Amino acid sequence: MDLQREIDAAVERGGGVVRVATGEREVLPFVLKSNVTLELADGAVLLASTNIADYAAALGERCFVGAEGATNIAIVGRGVIDGRGAVFREIGGLKGESQPQALPVLMRFTRCRDLRLEDFTYRRGAAWGCHLKNCDGVAMRRVKCFNHVNNTNDGIDIESANVTIEDCDIDADDDAIAFKTESDKSFAVTNVTVRNCRLASCCNAVKFGTGSYADFRDVTIEDCSLVRAKGNHRFNWWKSIPGVTNRICGIAALALEVVDGGRMDGIVVRNIEMDGYQTPIFVRLARRRDPPAGAETYLRNVLIENFRGVADSRIASSITGVPGLRPRGITLRNVSLVVPGGGTEADAAAQVPEKERAYPESFMFDKMPLPAYGFYVRHADGVLFENVDVKTASPDARKPFVFDDVN
């Protein structure tokens, strides 16, 4: 099936619907264009080419499904987009590129407006599953993702504004949903809602960062389940993280990170059920990279409420800044957690390194459990805990809360 030819023909007619009937078809990478809807029938499967030479980076970056600068485009229906990404595992050094650069993203939408994604499944990408890059106006509903075959198998990467994601099931080896501000360091991720979704990851279920050069503003995550992934290709944390209690688990259920000079303001996370992560909550403001001269970087005005879950390691939740950079205005309300326990007197007395320029993860502090079993807070202002309860499944010598340089 020459899908690109059919899309181009629809454009010549002024737009319309391109229908893919039931059945499997190997398809070359293609580009959606303005006013075109791709409709995948129930039982239709688009199989991505497994020849890297077919991914000629027509849009500047390799992807199977692409669009750039398009308006009023959609992918709908109950069919499947299959990246067959496992065959790309060994690719590296292509024209001097590293593996993540060389591997094609399954779907990438760049600077598009009025994008609609509904009801289909995407799976087995070579790299990221769906990259929403500097778009304005995105609705994703009832979409399923299963991305567990390769490096950097994120579910959704959001660098866009005015986005609604609801009733979706995202299961990924890397982050399930990652908000980033790195492709265009002046583009703000703002006015985003993620609602009523199942999010599963072997890394972070919901992550802001790591790329954090610009603004994250007015983002709401609500009524979601952050749960254990159903697959695991890359990560065996039980081998490298002391005290991990399950062979398949993620790093953090919720990770809020500003480490590249960006800004975060007005984040709401509420009505969350969590299971299958080493650490429930990780908040980090640091200076992996310095902001431009004279620019301000901050992480402030975060509300986390009605958050319940069971953790899979002794690594506590944390809210940390570094000297000169302090998260502020962080409220946790109605939070109920069960953690494994097992912390020792040595854990309670441990000195936590600053790691100002380190890559941020909840285990970044030399993989130590941290001096608290509940929350460790350092270099922060205006942190409010209201009706927060942390129980241990076994005895623990640490305190539930430890505060260091906190106002």
Regions found by a protein language model. Give the residues of each.
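Extracellular/periplasmic carbohydrate-active domains that bind, remodel
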Residues: M1-N407
